[in-house]
């Protein structure tokens, strides 16, 4: 049986017609755009006046129907209004126009059949063309006609023109491609939008001490701690070591806060009166907008805050003030960058405070052209369909393209730009299937399905070059990796100052505060989780929403979870890094064994020259590296990096390993499967444990050289050191180096297969393995 051909997961270079002109070499012959031009017929329905009444009451409920061939778009209707204003735009794709005339009909909405008020007909051959930066076409009044062509009462203000997707009316227009979508919410869900991430701050709460606390039970020493809450985040200090009514902590609690600040900081001082019972001794609420903002390492002033306590009086909750106070130093940290992405794929590294931002070094332009070969993501009317849209994120700016309805080869041709402040950043483009066009919210909360994702690191791009490639869209499923299609992108990174960009390579990757007052790894993990939750919640509340599953996929939430496949990939990445050293070791072994006598003799000569002229060693090394770099320039990568299934071990992963990777946390699998995976993990951990133990043994043997743990071995080593010191003192260094080098490169005739004396001595040294249980 013939095996099916392997799927093509490679990157392909494309030659699209960008901006109406061909791509010539690395430059554009037309500087219009990074996308292919798409022609549209635009119809702007502005308003009508003096419409005649059609009802028995003498009034009308007018709306406008714009018809072009089989495509039909309608405005909203007004109740009993003879001078309505709509100001709606309709866009018809020129590629799908199969008519010669455009008809705009004003109708009166009725229960049985809508009445005709009048119409305006346009010959498409007479419609003007407009391309920005031309000014918008001014709408005109047109007298309405009946079906016979006779003038009737009423006028309609319209503007009709041919344009491209660069027209400012394009984003808000009704599109003929989406004619099957109805409803205001559904139409809002298919339009292109630009979103901004909320401005995130680190909130530092330094809890110093409290005074004059009043515990209920005065006969015991209080076990007091402070609990702090900001929105959904809750942290607490340790129990104070000074068990008095004046406890001290001097402990930092870190939160993530987003502008505009909606929730206050709520602090409560609590006493642990029993293992599962805590008593509130006082609390206070502090609005975040009034807090100090710190931009450097200088400490802010501390303040005393009064504590309040709620007590029950006659079944009612009443607030009482008393003399208890808490001493704290609270500030919003503007000198840090709030990490909301995976550190490996960061798109922004600037601090929160805008005062600390440096000028941009360039501009990133991204053209999202089209996709091909998309897979069916859902069924509609008994057949597979896909309603695809793209999301791109770089820095604080998110963009969402319009949704192309029911197409496996959608064409977006939308272009976006971002300011670039650091070249060592990544732009992420994701493709999703829109599941909210036909009442998705009502059907059990449908989620937008992921089709694939592309990452492009800006530092891998040449400046001022247009990259046009087709990227494979790969998604990992429990049954293996699957190619969902391809997305065609055009990317250009323009540098405003080459010197400034080169200077960036000498600067720290993160703002200074990350190094002056570093946060712990556990703090960063917790804060990153909170930041992603805040960003996804805020973007979900936008209109139209950028849904939580989309935001989390773009931010790589959950990428830190255990994965056998990813562990194997990382292990082989380490082996790939070490392969160069291993190859050098094998080459040196061949030199020592005289596999190629001519090469070995040349190495002898080179070694003697370097020993006699040691000042040539460093220049020789750096000159060698320079020549290697120049030699490799001919074979430098000419394409951006892309998802590599072989490197990721996605094409060879075992189904059970993939099922484990997609398991929830905590696990939701049956106990027998969990037991099997636990035993497998124990087996792997046992091998790692053995390797770590062997490394520790070698280190302990080095320590035991002078520890007198083995008195004979230490005595021999000390005596050897004394003799070596005397010999090295009276013998020139060059002679010693020559002797050692010639001995290491000696002919196999003078070698023995038994281990050397130093190695035998080292292996006999004691380690602490004897003390292990």
Curated annotation (Swiss-Prot):
Q: Which residues cross the membrane?
A: 574-594, 608-628, 716-736
**UniProt record similarity statement:** Belongs to the MCTP family.
Residues annotated as binding Ca(2+) 1 are: 55, 61, 108, 110
Q: One Pfam annotation, family name?
A: C2
| Topological relation to the membrane, as annotated | Multi-pass membrane protein
GO MF, one term, reads: glycosyltransferase activity
- Oligomer and partners: Interacts with and regulates subcellular localization and trafficking of STM.
Domain C2 intervals: 22-142, 181-305, 345-471
Q: The organism sits in which domain of life?
A: Eukaryota
The name under which this protein is listed is FT-interacting protein 3
Bias type Basic and acidic residues, positions:
1-16
Q: What Gene3D superfamilies does the entry give?
A: C2 domain
Q: What does this protein do?
A: Required for proliferation and differentiation of shoot stem cells in the shoot apical meristem (SAM), thus determining the appropriate balance between the maintenance of shoot stem cells and their differentiation into other aboveground plant parts via the control of subcellular localization and intercellular trafficking of STM in the shoot apex. Prevents intracellular trafficking of STM to the plasma membrane in cells in the peripheral shoot meristem region thus facilitating STM recycling to the nucleus to maintain stem cells.
What cofactors does the UniProt entry give for this protein? Answer: Ca(2+)
Do you know which PANTHER family this protein is assigned to? FT-INTERACTING PROTEIN 3-RELATED, PHOSPHORIBOSYLANTHRANILATE TRANSFERASE ISOFORM 1
| Disruption of the gene: reported phenotype | No visible phenotypes. Plants lacking both FTIP3 and FTIP4 have a dwarf and bushy phenotype due to an accelerated stem cell differentiation causing early termination of shoot apices associated with an increased STM localization to the plasma membrane, but compromises nuclear localization.
Q: Name one GO cellular component term.
A: Golgi membrane
Task: Name the residues that bind Ca(2+) 2.
Answer: 55, 108, 110, 115
Signal peptide as annotated in the record: none
Tissues where the protein occurs:
Accumulates in vascular tissues, leaf primordia and flowers. Highly expressed in roots meristems and in both vegetative and inflorescence shoot apical meristems (SAMs).
Name one process (GO BP) from the record.
shoot apical meristem development
- List where in the cell it is found: Endoplasmic reticulum membrane; Cytoplasm; Vesicle; Cell membrane
Q: Which key words tag this protein in UniProt?
A: Calcium, Cell membrane, Cytoplasm, Endoplasmic reticulum, Endosome, Glycosyltransferase, Golgi apparatus, Membrane, Metal-binding, Repeat, Transferase, Transmembrane, Transmembrane helix
Extract the ranges annotated as region (Disordered): 1-24
Cross-referenced InterPro entries:
C2_dom (IPR000008), C2_domain_sf (IPR035892), C2B_MCTP_PRT_plant (IPR047257), C2C_MCTP_PRT_plant (IPR047258), C2D_MCTP_PRT_plant (IPR047255), MCTP_C (IPR013583), QUIRKY-like (IPR047259)
